[in-house]
């Protein structure tokens, strides 16, 4: 069944990996993401034309895959009938056309009785068209008669028919083998089916369906970070079709495509290739990234470093255990992060030449390590060529193969092992629920040693009760290790010393009679040497040096890092001292990773304070604010805990809020205060602050199919001119493609308001959406946003800006928000990013000018706000006046 390009040599006794070339991941295009079931002969032929004309064929894309939507029931003989309107000439003519372009053709089916389109997309003729009960008939039709080269087999019908995945997918495999044809067979079960899938297919889906959005890409990557052990022998973890070139940002698209390449996932383009954007086309044709995906080793990258929310992954390319490796710095967080890699972490030594595979340029030659600044949601991928290759000294459990691993059924009910996350594990993940039978075991299949000899192996394990595991080296039983620690997440090392062969070794852990302890990692060093401690110390020093120069951190945290560096580089350290240093450094680095987001928040509010101070005219409240801000800065610089930094932030915000309410706190003429801080949850990042009942999702807010009054009441607001801004769009009824708006008859009765003043919210149809065609119908209807996700994308682009200016004549409350008193069914309002700005009235500045002009002759005169001289009339009530250029109460 498996198609082999170059002979693969596998030592079946222990499944060792040997330096060999294998069939590489599938590259092509699939119809589903853009066209769903609404496909046709012309569409498929057009995409084949586009693959060639856009130069995609030239860089390796070759499959044109027809997904769901071509079926139309079955004939009396049981053969799948082809949809007469979508494919009036049948599929053979389409397949021939694809082949005539020098491309390969793919088809779709379901393991059960019906397809997903018949269930989720209303394509009712797609019932009874799955493989179930017609395995050999369909295999002969698709591969002997129509001669398709690839098939994706879904499982909606399999669920519907209550089938067993392993049995049914194997039956389909056997039917395909019976045709005698070479076919790429993709399983689409939306979770890793089990290790059995490697024996019958060329790729298998590991997650639910991808969708056009960063959250989907991030989630799929998260589920595949620890799947490297299951990618081997020309068979691959399928992370689903590509959503590149649709609605995500440039950095998100780069992460999406770059990581799919790096993880050796099949690359199936999902957008319309006929109108693909130039930027997207350039990314999809990046030959250096594609080379990682199509590397002859066929390996998936594994995690070598995990700090905070960031990951560094690595894999061999070109030759196993050679001097050339690829690394990816992956930052899924919402902030820019400085990341550091010690070359020791990727088993490289000496001078290392670094090449940027996104930018196609040499970065230079480095020693020890490299530091990279990675924007939010971004990835940087490099090729490293080193002088020497070091033995790998740490093998995390999450890189090992679990023989009974599966993700379809509850692992506890099935009695199968899983990978679990915990902060106490070395890499943040451990292997648990092992044992109970021989097959529920853990194996590192390629433990490579440069020189034969005696080696000490350290197993980090945890178990609150006494548990054990047996160690097998290259098929030979070594010994049983008994483990008991103070808790399930408290890991302790258990050692054995054994002779090991030069080259590849396999180490298996099992317990066939009882549960095993949780396994964190295995580390290896030549007996009598301190390889592990020395390399860990070198890696830690690099991390500490990066931290010591991080301007986001407090001075005290940087000083603590510098002190540890000084101790670590003192020389002649005892092993006990190194262990203490490593422990202290790990604690500091963990603390810093936890504190960085709070440090960033502090800097945000400090910069916000500085900008408002810069905009302020001199006054006593301003001097008070400056003093308070300086105190906050002093407190921040010596802070080492979350509470201390949070207190500094709270003090900053309180000082600003107090200042804005001071009567004599005023901006300079021509300047304005940014008072957005007075609005709670101004960016809809949480679910509080606003009265009314909005829906919070996708980073914005929504009101749908109702009247509403979304508002906040700000108290003790001083007189002046307030400007309220927000992103907001309004649709009066269901989407009519803007017919009423274009005719000038659209009646919007929804408003942005401040007290009694209001302005109509911008119509949904008031702004065109140039990239609407890149979105599916769930986000784009008639060329306009049709979801909160789509609206938020447009808001981020600066669209649908609403603004209202309100003159507040006396101190009191300011109620601001969005409201609709009358509505028609399906009205929709989406909103985000409220801002509040303040400036004094012209009369105020005129008064100051008048006072300054008169000071030379009337230093002690007092003037009202309009600049008129104040007379001491005992009948006058107290009021705000200006004396010697300063506002006072008289």
Spans of model-derived segments:
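Aromatic-lined carbohydrate-binding/catalytic grooves of carbohydrate-active enzymes
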Residues: 43, 47, 51-162
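Carbohydrate-binding surface patches
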Residues: 260-263, 268-270, 306-348, 377
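Extracytoplasmic
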Residues: 337, 348-351, 379-535, 539, ...
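C-terminal outer-membrane/trafficking sorting elements
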Residues: 6, 847-890
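Structural recognition of the beta-strand scaffold that forms the well-ordered cores
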Residues: 25-31, 60-67, 104-109, 149-154, ...
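Amphipathic, heptad-repeat alpha-helical segments
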Residues: 529-572, 586-639
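Intrinsically disordered, low-complexity Pro/Gly/Ser/Thr-rich segments with frequent PxxP/GP/PP motifs
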Residues: 361-387
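Glycan-recognition surfaces
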Residues: 128, 134-137, 167, 182-272
């Amino acid at each position: 069944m498996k198609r082999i390009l170059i002979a693969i040599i596998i030592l079946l006794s222990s499944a060792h990996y040997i330096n060999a070339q294998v069939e590489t991941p599938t590259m092509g295009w699939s119809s589903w993401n853009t066209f769903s079931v609404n496909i046709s002969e012309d569409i498929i032929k057009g995409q084949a034309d586009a693959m060639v004309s856009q130069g995609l064929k030239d860089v390796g894309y070759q499959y044109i895959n027809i997904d769901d939507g071509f079926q139309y029931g079955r004939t009396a003989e049981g053969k799948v009938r082809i949809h007469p309107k979508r494919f009036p000439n049948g599929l053979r003519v389409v397949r021939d056309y694809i082949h005539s372009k020098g491309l390969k053709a793919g088809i779709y089916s379901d393991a059960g009785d019906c397809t997903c389109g018949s269930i989720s997309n209303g394509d009712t003729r797609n019932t009874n068209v799955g493989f179930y009960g017609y395995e050999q008939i369909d295999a002969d039709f698709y591969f002997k008669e129509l001669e398709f080269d690839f098939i994706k087999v879904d499982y909606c019908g399999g669920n519907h028919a209550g089938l067993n995945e392993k049995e049914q997918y194997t039956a389909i495999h056997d039917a395909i083998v019976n045709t005698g044809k070479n076919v790429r067979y993709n399983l689409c079960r939306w979770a890793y089916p089990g290790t059995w899938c490697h024996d019958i297919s060329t790729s298998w889906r590991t997650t639910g369906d991808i969708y056009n959005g960063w959250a989907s890409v991030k989630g799929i990557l998260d589920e595949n970070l620890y799947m490297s052990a299951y990618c081997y022998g020309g068979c691959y973890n399928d992370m689903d079709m590509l959503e590149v070139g649709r609605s995500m940002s440039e950095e998100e698209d780069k992460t999406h495509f770059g990581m799919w390449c790096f993880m050796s996932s099949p690359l199936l383009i999902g957008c319309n290739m006929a109108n693909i954007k130039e930027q997207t086309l350039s990314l999809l044709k990046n030959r250096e990234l594609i080379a990682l995906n199509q590397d002859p080793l066929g390996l998936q990258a594994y995690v070598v470093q995990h700090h905070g929310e960031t990951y560094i992954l690595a894999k061999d390319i070109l030759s196993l255990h050679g001097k050339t490796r690829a690394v990816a710095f992956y930052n899924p967080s919402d902030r820019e992060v400085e990341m550091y890699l010690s070359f020791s972490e990727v088993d490289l030594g000496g001078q290392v030449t670094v090449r940027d595979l996104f930018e196609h340029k040499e970065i230079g030659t480095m020693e020890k390590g490299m530091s990279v600044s990675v924007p939010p949601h971004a990835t940087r991928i490099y090729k490293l060529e080193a002088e020497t290759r070091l033995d790998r000294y740490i093998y995390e459990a999450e890189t090992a193969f679990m023989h009974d691993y599966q993700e379809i059924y509850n692992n506890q009910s099935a009695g199968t092992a899983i990978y679990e996350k915990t902060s106490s594990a070395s890499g943040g993940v451990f292997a648990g629920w092992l044992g109970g039978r021989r097959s529920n075991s853990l194996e590192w299949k390629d433990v490579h040693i440069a020189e034969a000899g005696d080696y000490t192996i350290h197993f980090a394990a945890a178990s609150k009760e006494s548990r054990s595991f047996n160690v097998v080296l290259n098929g030979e039983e070594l010994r049983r290790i008994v483990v008991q620690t103070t808790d399930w997440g408290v890991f302790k090392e258990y050692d054995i010393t054994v002779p090991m062969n030069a080259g590849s070794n396999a180490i298996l852990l099992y317990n066939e009679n009882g549960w095993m302890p949780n396994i964190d990692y295995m580390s290896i060093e030549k007996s009598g040497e301190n390889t592990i401690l020395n390399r860990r110390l070198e890696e830690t020093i690099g991390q500490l040096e990066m931290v010591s120069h991080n301007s986001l951190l407090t001075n005290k945290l940087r000083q603590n890092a510098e002190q540890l560096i000084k101790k670590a580089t003192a020389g002649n350290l005892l092993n006990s001292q190194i262990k203490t240093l490593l422990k202290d450094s790990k604690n500091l680095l963990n603390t810093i990773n936890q504190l960085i987001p709070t440090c960033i928040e502090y800097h945000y509010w400090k910069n916000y304070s500085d900008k408002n101070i810069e905009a302020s005219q001199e006054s006593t409240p301003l001097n008070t604010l400056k003093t308070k801000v300086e105190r906050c800065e002093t407190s921040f610089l010596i802070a080492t805990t979350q509470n201390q930094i949070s207190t500094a932030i709270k003090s900053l915000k309180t000082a600003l809020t107090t200042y804005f309410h001071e009567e004599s706190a005023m901006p300079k003429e021509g300047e304005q205060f940014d008072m957005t801080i007075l609005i709670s949850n101004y960016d809809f990042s949480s679910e509080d602050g606003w009265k009314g009942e909005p829906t919070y999702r996708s980073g914005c807010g929504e009101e749908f199919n109702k009247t509403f009054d979304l508002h906040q009441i700000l108290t003790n607001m001083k007189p002046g001119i307030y400007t309220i801004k927000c992103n907001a769009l309004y649709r009066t009824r269901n989407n009519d493609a803007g017919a009423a708006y274009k005719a000038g008859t659209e009646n919007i009765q929804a408003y942005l308001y401040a007290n009694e003043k209001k302005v109509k919210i911008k119509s949904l149809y008031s702004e065109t959406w140039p990239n609407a065609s890149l979105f599916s119908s769930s986000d784009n209807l008639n060329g306009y946003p049709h979801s909160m996700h789509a609206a938020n994308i447009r808001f981020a682009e600066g669209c649908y800006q609403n603004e209202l200016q309100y003159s507040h004549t006396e101190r009191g409350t300011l109620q601001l928000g969005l409201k609709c008193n009358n509505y028609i069914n399906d009205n929709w309002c989406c909103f985000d990013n409220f801002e509040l700005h303040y400036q004094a009235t012209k009369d105020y500045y005129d008064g100051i000018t008048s006072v300054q002009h008169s000071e030379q002759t009337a230093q002690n005169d007092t003037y009202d706000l309009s600049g008129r001289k104040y007379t001491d009339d005992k009948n006058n009530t107290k009021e705000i006046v200006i004396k010697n250029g300063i506002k006072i109460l008289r």
